[in-house]
């Protein structure tokens, strides 16, 4: 390893002559968005002369020393958050394309040997990976690694928390965008708010672990809860981090939804006038968050200002995607394939040379937020020899093939590969020779690119005369999930009678009805009976709907919630592994559950209305739509 380090020092001595890039505001910054305050500052990094020699391997052209590595363990997630998951779904990598446990451990050791002292595991949702606990236990044994973090949505955290803590996890970021359980379901398209909040409370009980709650603020959706989150810091030693809404392909980003951190601070100051910023000396080095607090409160409040005031000049982080690509900038379009180099038998020295070459191509800062928002399906570009361009044209339409061809021609002639800068020409050629392949991959499916030739009624023959069942014999088996919902409206006095409120004390101090309380009619328990009926209906959907295939249901979850004194919500989520979707099963379950509620309660009133039944989401198969209704 000593020889490797010396070779990098020799090749990179020119770094001492470079000064850090000046901080520049986004030229696309809109006048309609509040300008960051003039007293903002750049966080200082350790001078390059005082950094240990090995860190030259992970030092870029702007004197930034990368000591923080984020590793994605999986592309999968058990939530479908609107700001993260495109409406039309994502194309997951095949299982054999995902980094194995041994590969992740090897890369972790390699980066730590080159100066990384902090590793954070992300996803997708990292805790859905089956071997996450033993994997982190092995990483925790690496000498020189000081901090291990996890970013999680908290759904599965409570049952894994103790083992992860013992394995060395001392940094925990939990995503929670609302303190309202119904709004949580709206944002994530899934249930589980109570489990997330329980995970936060359980984590705060542990010693030697920092807990942060990440909250993405979207104007008109959860900005009215900002002060409620700040109030959490009164009695909890937690850091609430408000994240500016960032544009990623498919998340319908709009400046109308964007709220800058300066606007958030104004909102907080109205309720907490003493709210103030920590001094530079109190801040952690390379901290991405601008940290504030209310004097006397136990916790902190941070702002991650990636859009309105970026922190690129102090960036010290690198990322490895779940399928093994090194990404030097979150918003960059380029990724370098480490997985294939490992599987081709590359030595540690060869991998370090590739990593160093990629780091040296890191730009001074990412693009402006409007430019980022306009980048659709940003491709993965693995830079290398032109003769090794690899594109899979199988099953692509003629239009797509032309687009890819034009894209590659433009790429090959671009300055990104053939630099005309005489000062750095030798260095660029040296770096490029160490990077392999060029390929294009979409991060998500795109409605504009879908083949429209198959927009036909699948249950009618092409001549339009005879109904028919769809042939699914050639389809592949995938995980299928569908979520349907029904809303029932009751006359104002009916639910009160059924709940028998005065006897059962089901009114809280705010005169709110208990949302998960069972109601009882003369026929018996209404909700329990209706859930049984809905479950039976799900299993018999093919007997009710003529062209539904008989399928083995693996999971059926029906939840009935009292929204207010006149409304009841039915959620039916159905899952299975098969060749066809389960949306009809979910809709049937929600419908029959609602009809049974009506039947159980009709003696009190015939004016109960099944207001609507709709499909909320479906996932799996070619036409995945994590959000159907808006």
From Swiss-Prot:
It catalyses: GTP + AH2 + S-adenosyl-L-methionine = (8S)-3',8-cyclo-7,8-dihydroguanosine 5'-triphosphate + 5'-deoxyadenosine + L-methionine + A + H(+); (8S)-3',8-cyclo-7,8-dihydroguanosine 5'-triphosphate = cyclic pyranopterin phosphate + diphosphate. SMART domains: Elp3. Pathway: Cofactor biosynthesis; molybdopterin biosynthesis. Residues 61-298 form the Radical SAM core domain. GTP binds at residues 70, 120, 151, 212, 317-319. GO terms for biological process: Mo-molybdopterin cofactor biosynthetic process. Residues 402-629 are annotated as: Molybdenum cofactor biosynthesis protein C. Pfam families: Fer4_12 (PF13353), MoaC (PF01967), Mob_synth_C (PF06463), Radical_SAM (PF04055). [4Fe-4S] cluster 2 binds at residues 312, 315, 329. Its EC number is 4.1.99.22, 4.6.1.17. GO terms for molecular function: 4 iron, 4 sulfur cluster binding; cyclic pyranopterin monophosphate synthase activity; GTP 3',8'-cyclase activity; GTP binding; metal ion binding. Its cofactor is [4Fe-4S] cluster. Keywords: 4Fe-4S, GTP-binding, Iron, Iron-sulfur, Lyase, Metal-binding, Molybdenum cofactor biosynthesis, Nucleotide-binding, S-adenosyl-L-methionine. Isoform mocs1a and isoform mocs1b probably form a heterooligomer. Isoform mocs1a and isoform mocs1b probably form a complex that catalyzes the conversion of 5'-GTP to cyclic pyranopterin monophosphate (cPMP). mocs1a catalyzes the cyclization of GTP to (8S)-3',8-cyclo-7,8-dihydroguanosine 5'-triphosphate and mocs1b catalyzes the subsequent conversion of (8S)-3',8-cyclo-7,8-dihydroguanosine 5'-triphosphate to cPMP. This is Molybdenum cofactor biosynthesis protein 1. It comes from Dictyostelium discoideum.
